[in-house]
Structures are given as C-alpha cells and as structure tokens.
Regions:
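Extended, Lys/Arg-enriched charged tracts that mediate electrostatic binding to polyanionic substrates
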Residues: 155-202
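Conserved amphipathic alpha-helical "coupling/scaffold" segments
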Residues: 1-144, 150, 154, 158, ...
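ATPase nucleotide-binding head domains, primarily ABC-like/P-loop NTPase cores
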Residues: 286-289, 294-486
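Non-transmembrane, heptad-repeat alpha-helical coiled-coil rod segments
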Residues: 238-272
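Long, charged, glycine-rich C-terminal linkers/tails
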Residues: 176-191, 280-303
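Extended, charged coiled-coil "arm/hinge" scaffolds of SMC/Rad50-like chromosome-maintenance ATPases
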Residues: 128-146, 229-250
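SMC-family hinge/dimerization module
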Residues: 190-221, 231, 294-316
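Amphipathic alpha-helical transducer elements in NTP-driven molecular machines
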Residues: 12, 44-47, 65-68, 96, ...
Length: 486
C-alpha cells in the first residue's frame, strides 16, 4: 500500500499520535512506520491483538514498561567477547527486569488455562528472563558510573584500605592547615596525590614535591615528604581497585555471552507488545471500538468521527457503501465538510487495516482493500508548473492504471479545474471506468450533471453535506440519498 496516498488522508498524523502512546523507542518507530495490511486474516489477527491488550489494560492496568535503552550495540560487543562497561551492564539488567515484569504481568492477568489460548501468548512466551543474572548485576552496581563496595570481597577490602589510607594522609596534612605558609587552609589533590597549597615565597619551608602552581604563580601545590609513602600506597591501592573492577566487569559480562540471542528476541518482543498496547491505549483515549472485518466488500460506518478532529467539535456521521451502491457522490457547499468526509472514510479504513480500533459505534464494518487510492488537494507537481487540472489528471491516470476490483478510490472535486461541461463529462467517464471495474468509489463534486447522473444510474448514489438554510451554516451531517446544493 503506497504511503503517498495515505499521506493525502493525513494518516501520518494518526500514526504520530499513536506513537505518543508507545513508551519504547522501538514501539514508537514501529508505530510511525505502520502500513495497513491488505491481508484479511492478518487484519483480523491484528484486531484480535488490540482487543486482548484492551482487555488486559482494563483487567490488570497498563503494561509495566518504561523507556528502554538501545542495547543492540552492547550485544554486538558481547558477540565479540568484549567486556561491557558499568553503564552497558546496567542497561542490560534493566532489559532483563522489564522482561521479567512483562512475564509477571501476563501471568497475573491470565488464568493458567487461558495462557496458551491467548492471542498475545506467542509474544510473551518468547520473552526470556533470568532473575539470577539480573540480580547479580543490580547488586554489583551502585550507579552507571560506579560499582558497589560489595560487588566482591576483594573490592570491599581494597576500598576499606583506600579510605583508611586517605584518612591517614589527611591526618598528617591537617597539621599544616594552621601554618602561615599556606595560601588556603585546605587539603587538595593534584596528579592523584594529596597536596597542600603553599605560598610561593615559603616554598623552602615545606619539604616535598611540587605538583603544580596556580595560574598567577603565587601558589605551589606541594606534597610534603611525610605523606609521600602514604600517597604511594594509595596509588597502588587505586591500581588494585581498577584491576578488581575489571575482573568484576569481566565476571558480569561472562554471564551475558550465552544469552545475547535471547536478549535480541526480548527487544523485538518488547517493541511489538509496546505497539500493541499503544493501539489499545489510543483506542481508549478516543473512545474507539473494534470494527467488524467483512468479506462482502462493503463499508458501514455508524456515527463515525474524524480521528484528528477534537471530539468536542467533530460531528459524527453515518456512511456506507458497497451493499446497494458502488459509487457515492457527495455534494454540498464548499464549507460543508465534503473533503473531511472523504478523509474520514479513508482514514477509518486504513486504521482498521492496521489493527487499530475506529472512532465509531459498535457494529461498524470495514472491508480489507488491497489498496486505498486518493486524489485530494493539490500536489507538489503543481509547483512544477502543472495546472491544478493537469496535476489531478496525472494522479487519476496513475490510479486508473493501478486499481483492482478490491481497491478503494477517493476523489475530491472530480473533473474540477477545467471547462464545466468538459469536466462533468470527464468525471462521468472516470467514474464509469471505476464502476465497470467493480471499484468502490467516494467522490465529491459540485457539478449538477454528476448529481443528475447518479440519480438515474444503477450502482450510483448521491449524498450531501447538510446545510442549515435558516442560520446559513453547514451542520457537517452527511445525508445519503439526497443531493446537495453546491
């Protein structure tokens, strides 16, 4: 199904709203790239998935999910037997945690006997969890930059010795803090060595090693001789600490080498479930219902609402096609909402074919088309110095060359932009071609010749956007069987 036609209906805006209901970067990406399926059984499956997610939300609350990191680069490193950083290990532990919580959510939502009959079981059942590995990583890590002291007994011992040695150094250096030789009464660190700030004129008064000067040269940072050995001991302890951290990171990475494929599957399943539950949350937000998917090539929408118009202002309409007529001609004033009706119809069909619930009353039914074609509004080709009429004709010719008997065609102001008589005759010819090829067509027009043609031709029906004569304003209601006044 070609996205250029869907974009004319503003389907991309629907997907953008849907993506906001997804939580993970994968779910959002899947939502933004959603394309209607033209496989009836697949559409039914997608609708069933949305229905089960809808029920699970009402039964057990929302899926326990937060934004997740992209761990695919981490897994690639593991496949090369690399040692992961603290942050990367923490990222993977978070994925394992979310995976476990997904399983717990599903298990608590379903009776044991229901699990395997669940539509979503095939996704949840593929998710791998390992609390032992998850717990080992979380227990070892303090935050994304540091390990806990208890990550190993050796690390705990080394860090105790570090703190002890640092305190010994500070105790010795504190004796200098009351000295007139210091620029400031503080102990600081230069080149990983504890030093004191000495006034440059007293450099000979404190024996030790100079590790730097202030920008003005008035201060020298001196490591006194009486802490030299302690600073050396501290440096050795820090080297031992780094080596022990490396050993711990290696040990934790070793836990993950054999489960990289499981984690890749987890990411995939988390993204798919995030999308499915996003569909359900979107349905709840717009008070949508599950459409009936029929095989008889008709569409019957009851009190349907445009999904991009606020529910406070949108006027629900009833619209059907395919049972008693194949071509529906919509007429009425330019401000009466004819184009909105076209877009509503196309959007609803596209949404249903993506597994989305539709903003319509229960009992509304949709056919799974092999393609949805639309000629609505002006195209970029107009900017390439084609007239409005020529632009529409280029689009329509492409549509006529591509349609099948299972296609839906939406035409806005067919035949407009040229001589009215020629435009009306051209419109009739195009509609007859589509009718003879058994295509379902919705078209708007302001030509009376087309309205009259629909009145006397089998398979055609008129409809109009109602206009309030007394108040001189459109009501936006659709009246099928009644031609309108343009």
């Amino acid at each position: 199904m070609e996205t250029k036609y869907l974009n004319k209906l503003e389907f991309d805006k629907v997907l953008n709203i849907l993506s906001n209901f997804a939580t993970t970067y994968i779910g959002k990406e899947l939502a933004l790239n959603l394309i209607p399926s033209n496989d009836k059984e697949m559409v039914k499956q997608l609708q069933n998935e949305t229905s089960e997610a809808y029920s699970l939300i009402y039964r057990n609350g929302n899926l326990p999910i937060d934004a997740i990191p992209n761990i695919l680069p981490h897994l690639k490193m593991l496949d090369s037997n690399c040692i992961l950083s603290i942050k990367y290990l923490l990222d993977i532990a978070n994925i394992l945690k979310i995976s476990r919580e997904f399983q717990e959510y599903f298990s608590s939502s379903m009776q044991i006997t229901e699990n395997k009959s669940s539509i979503l079981y095939k996704y949840f059942s593929k998710i791998y969890s390992n609390y032992n590995i998850e717990n080992q990583i979380f227990s070892a890590i303090l935050d994304e930059n540091a390990l806990n002291d208890n990550a190993s007994t050796s690390l705990a011992s080394i860090r105790r010795n570090i703190r002890k040695t640092e305190q010994q150094i500070r105790d010795k250096l504190n004796s200098y803090l009351s000295s007139k030789y210091l620029q400031e009464r503080l102990v600081t660190i230069k080149n990983n060595r504890f030093v004191v700030p000495v006034k440059s004129e007293y450099r000979s008064e404190i024996k030790g090693f100079i590790h730097g000067t202030s920008s003005t040269g008035s201060t020298l940072f001196i490591e006194p001789m009486n802490v030299f050995e302690l600073n050396n001991s501290l440096a050795v302890l820090h080297i031992e600490e780094e080596r022990e951290i490396e050993r711990i990171l290696q040990r934790l990475s070793n836990l993950l080498y054999d489960i990289t494929e499981n984690l890749k599957i987890n990411i995939n399943m988390i993204g798919k479930l995030d999308l499915i539950f996003a569909k359900a949350k979107y349905a709840i937000s717009i008070d949508a219902t599950e459409p009936i998917i029929n095989s008889e090539k008709y569409v019957n929408l009851i009190k349907v609402r445009h999904p991009l118009i606020s529910s406070d202002t949108v006027v629900p309409i009833d619209i059907n096609i395919g049972k008693t007529f194949q071509v529906l001609l919509i007429t009425g004033s330019n401000t009466g909402g004819k184009t909105v009706t076209l877009k509503t119809f196309g959007l609803i069909c596209a949404m249903a074919m993506c597994g989305l619930y539709i903003p319509a009353k229960e009992g509304s039914s949709v056919y799974v088309f092999d393609n949805i074609f639309a000629d609505i509004g002006d195209e970029q080709s107009i900017l390439a110095s084609l007239s409005t009429f020529s632009s529409h004709m280029v689009n329509i010719i492409e549509i006529l060359n591509s349609v099948t008997s299972n296609s839906l065609v939406l035409l806005d102001e067919i035949g407009s932009g040229t001589d009215p008589i020629e435009g009306a005759n051209l419109g009739i010819s195009i509609l007859n071609y589509l009718y003879n090829n058994k295509v379902l067509v919705l078209s708007t027009t302001h030509y009376p010749e087309l309205k009259n043609y629909a009145l006397v031709t089998d398979g055609y029906e008129n409809a109009s956007s109602e206009f309030d004569i007394e108040n001189l304003r459109p009501t936006y209601k659709l009246l099928i069987g009644i031609p309108g006044q343009s």
